[in-house]
């Protein structure tokens, strides 16, 4: 059990946790160009006897050393969400065996723990150090790229995503993220090229459909955008997708369909102010002006900027 726990630790923080809020997302308002950076989620192996990182030498694990004793302590601290102590134990582990080939992974783990604590610059430095040690490690590049997005260093993120597709041309997450960054920059041609490349490598890709949905919405093709959103929603519904499809329905005067999506989204996340803003827009289109004003206030109460709320409904 202890060995399994240590090995789990070695892989755990290489993954960008779903609880790091999309931090790794580029976001704009629902009535503007909506974009988001996909997070890569991979299964954590439950048991293994050897450990290797992409671009690193495979090594056997001896769990009897002080190096792994520190890791076990670090994992206990992580389980308790005691990030500062976990950080200390990882540093002690690295210091105990400076030449251990697993250190690039520990440094990446350290970066992710720092990210949890909001130490973004320190996290970037440590991701960079880990990547210098294993330059072709796609997961590390992806982690640093998503952190660059969180730190509003979009050009650096783009550079990392491009490195990923140079190593692995069929990596759909990286291509999706590149496409979404181009979309944020209003470079629609390059965005479309990335989404088409995803389709070429992965004909049934949901990410390709999602990217094309946002692209069509950004370029005013709301009917086609709604169709793409529908394909993704069938397989993997989310509030973001429902809200964006609802907005497309509003733009094409399909008010009943928009109402269904808005109500479904509000049932899932009733604290999302933008959903009330969408509903206010719907009610205004139905000439329910008093109800629309109530929803505008609800949107503001749930964190929407008052100026944005009023501007969106002009």
Model-derived segments and their meaning:
Residues 29-30, 46, 51-61, 277-314:
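Terminal, low-structured helical/coil segments at or just beyond the last alpha-helical repeat
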Residues 66, 100-103, 137, 171, ...:
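Residue-level recognition of tetratricopeptide repeat
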Residues 79-80, 116, 150-151, 184-185, ...:
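Register position in tetratricopeptide repeats
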Residues 96-99, 133, 167, 201, ...:
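Structural marker of alpha-solenoid helical repeat scaffolds
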Residues 103-106, 140, 174, 208, ...:
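TPR alpha-solenoid repeat register
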């Amino acid at each position: 059990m202890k060995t399994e726990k240590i090995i789990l630790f070695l892989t755990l923080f290489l993954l960008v946790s779903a609880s790091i809020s999309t931090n790794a997302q580029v976001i704009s308002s629902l009535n503007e160009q909506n974009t988001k950076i996909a997070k890569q989620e991979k299964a954590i192996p439950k048991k293994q006897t050897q450990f290797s990182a992409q671009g690193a030498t495979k090594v056997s694990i001896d769990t009897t050393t002080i190096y792994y004793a520190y890791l076990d302590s670090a994992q206990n601290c992580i389980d308790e969400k005691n990030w500062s102590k976990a950080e200390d134990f990882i540093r002690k582990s690295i210091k105990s065996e400076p030449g251990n080939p697993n250190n690039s992974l520990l440094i990446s783990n350290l970066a992710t723990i720092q990210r949890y604590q909001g130490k973004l610059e320190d996290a970037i430095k440590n991701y960079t150090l880990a990547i210098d040690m294993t330059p072709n490690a796609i997961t590390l590049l992806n982690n640093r790229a998503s952190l660059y997005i969180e730190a509003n260093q979009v050009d650096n993120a783009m550079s990392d995503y491009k490195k990923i597709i140079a190593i692995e041309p069929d990596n759909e997450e990286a291509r999706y993220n590149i496409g979404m960054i181009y979309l944020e920059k209003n470079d629609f041609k390059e965005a479309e090229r990335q989404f088409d490349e995803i389709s070429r490598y992965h004909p049934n890709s949901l990410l390709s459909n999602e990217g094309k949905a946002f692209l069509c919405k950004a370029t005013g093709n709301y009917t086609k955008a709604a169709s793409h959103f529908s394909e993704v929603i069938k397989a993997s519904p989310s509030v973001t997708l429902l809200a964006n499809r609802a907005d497309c329905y509003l733009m094409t005067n399909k008010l009943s369909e928009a109402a269904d999506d808005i109500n479904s989204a509000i049932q899932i996340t009733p604290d999302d102010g933008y959903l009330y803003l969408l509903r206010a827009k719907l009610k205004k289109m139905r000439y329910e002006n008093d109800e629309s004003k109530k929803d505008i206030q609800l949107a503001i109460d749930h964190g929407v900027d008052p100026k944005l709320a009023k501007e969106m409904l002009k």
